[in-house]
């Protein structure tokens, strides 16, 4: 089975993935069910791709890098500026990079965010599946999941799940 690139992310009802300052503390205030399907999803991937800003937030929020058991890549404009034994830093196009990854044996590839990375991948049609959990809060402002896109992407609903008051939408390319 071919590996897929999967965007797995939470958004507010108004489409924000973080507050304007990049904080995601609003997610901590949400009461769902267990881990809202995260553990089940995490078992389906063996590779995690992060943008530089998200990587830096993760390093601040967690004393131990949380993806040590996965192959982890961070997209950055200056890969030589970073060093981390758990991460490979990348500066190349999303489509070319993921095409190479898909040729390797393995499980799915998690596109973990943030917004700049997601939009770069969207512009290159490099996301195969979208698993988006909508959290019942309207932030009013913040960092939108999708912005400045010019290409239309048609999707087909694969399924939905409810976790307490949150709804998870699973789409594949149409």
Curated annotation (Swiss-Prot):
The keyword Membrane applies. GO terms for biological process: riboflavin biosynthetic process. Its main location: membrane. GO terms for molecular function: 5-amino-6-(5-phosphoribosylamino)uracil reductase activity. The lineage of its organism: Bacteria, Bacillati, Bacillota, Bacilli, Bacillales. It is a single-pass membrane protein. To B.subtilis YyaP. This is Uncharacterized protein YwjB. It comes from the Bacteria. One of its GO terms (cellular component) is membrane. The gene is ywjB. Keywords: Membrane, Transmembrane, Transmembrane helix. InterPro entries: DHFR-like_dom_sf (IPR024072), RibDG_C (IPR002734), Riboflavin_Biosynth_HTPR (IPR050765). PANTHER family: 2,5-DIAMINO-6-RIBOSYLAMINO-4(3H)-PYRIMIDINONE 5'-PHOSPHATE REDUCTASE (PTHR38011:SF11), DIHYDROFOLATE REDUCTASE FAMILY PROTEIN (AFU_ORTHOLOGUE AFUA_8G06820) (PTHR38011). It is found in: Membrane. The chain crosses the membrane at residues 126-146.
């Amino acid at each position: 089975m071919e590996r897929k690139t999967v965007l797995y992310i939470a958004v507010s009802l108004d489409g924000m993935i973080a507050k304007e300052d990049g904080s995601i503390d609003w997610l901590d205030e949400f009461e769902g069910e267990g881990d809202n399907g995260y553990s089940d999803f995490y078992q389906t991937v063996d590779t995690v791709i992060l943008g530089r800003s998200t990587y830096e937030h993760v390093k601040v929020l967690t004393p131990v890098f949380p993806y040590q058991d996965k192959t982890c890549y961070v997209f950055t404009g200056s890969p030589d500026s970073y060093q981390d034994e758990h991460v490979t830093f990348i500066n190349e196009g999303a489509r070319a990079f993921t095409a190479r990854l898909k040729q390797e044996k393995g499980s799915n590839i998690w596109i973990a965010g943030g917004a700049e990375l997601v939009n770069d991948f969207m512009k290159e049609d490099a996301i195969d599946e979208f698993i988006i959990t909508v959290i019942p809060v309207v932030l009013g402002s913040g960092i939108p999941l999708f912005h400045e896109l010019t290409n239309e992407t048609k999707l087909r609903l694969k399924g939905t799940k409810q976790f307490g008051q949150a709804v998870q939408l699973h789409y594949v390319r149409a």
